């Protein structure tokens, strides 16, 4: 099935390290969207993480609708970058 996957990519890791409160996150991060043919959302996220090897991505996520108001979110974090500002 076709699954839309989003990825937040860090364009300046040094800025991320300095921005402890993430007040300027939008200044050094960008979001990209991909469409993947995968069996499930977790595999789709993993496929994009492989595609982005060598890039400084913050997180990858996809959503599956449960109802008109609710979605199930599947998130994959890059622990190395995520922990820089924690």
Swiss-Prot record:
Domain of life: Bacteria
Name of protein: Uncharacterized protein YdcO
Organism: Bacillus subtilis (strain 168)
Gene: ydcO
């Amino acid at each position: 099935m076709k699954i839309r996957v989003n990825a937040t990519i860090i364009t300046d890791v040094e800025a991320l390290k300095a921005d402890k409160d993430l007040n300027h996150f939008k200044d050094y991060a960008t979001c990209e969207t991909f469409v993947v043919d995968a069996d499930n959302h977790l595999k789709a996220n993993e496929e994009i993480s492989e595609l982005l090897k060598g890039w400084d991505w913050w997180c990858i996520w996809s959503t599956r609708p449960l109802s008109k108001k609710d979605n199930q979110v599947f998130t994959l974090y890059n622990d190395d970058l995520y922990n820089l500002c924690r």
